[in-house]
Amino acid sequence: TVGGNIAENSGGKKAVLWGTAVDNIASYRMVTADGNWMEVERLEHTCSKISPEADIRWRITVKDGRTADPEKARVLSTRELVTPGSIYRRKGLGKDVTNKFLGGLPAVQKEGTDGIITSARWILHKMPPLTYTVCLEFFGAATLAGKAILEISNLLGNGYKGCMLAG
């Protein structure tokens, strides 16, 4: 589900290009454990993966859950959350699955413990005009793998025969 994607901060095979759920969320709505509506909106979205150097701004609005329609519900509170981009990834490792708090960002990577996500808006990306994915795996000495990766990167990094390098 869309809510499960956010709750797990999922990425899939295109995460190398565009990141995981947190990178591509425009906004989402959820019902909290106390029965209120919570709307979370990413402000000033760059339409790209979150950079470790960036500060990411979120607007969090809590609305009265006694009103069934969240659009008509009374606003109980609004706050802005600023999180450093570095909390979303570990240097050299990609997504940091050990950091469940994520600076206080509700629901993302919490596996459903903050509430039930009911809807979301996403940043969509146009697929590149490529039809094949190649995944490389190396065994043996890391120095040999490093040399091979550098050679491949130099070849593909220049758009060799329509190839696109990601990773």
Name each region found by the language model.
Residues 1-152:
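FAD-binding subdomain of flavoenzyme oxidoreductases
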Residues 134-137, 162-167:
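C-terminal cap/substrate-recognition region of VAO/PCMH-type FAD-linked oxidoreductases
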Residues 146-165:
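Acidic-enriched catalytic cores of C-N bond-cleaving enzymes acting on peptides and small amides
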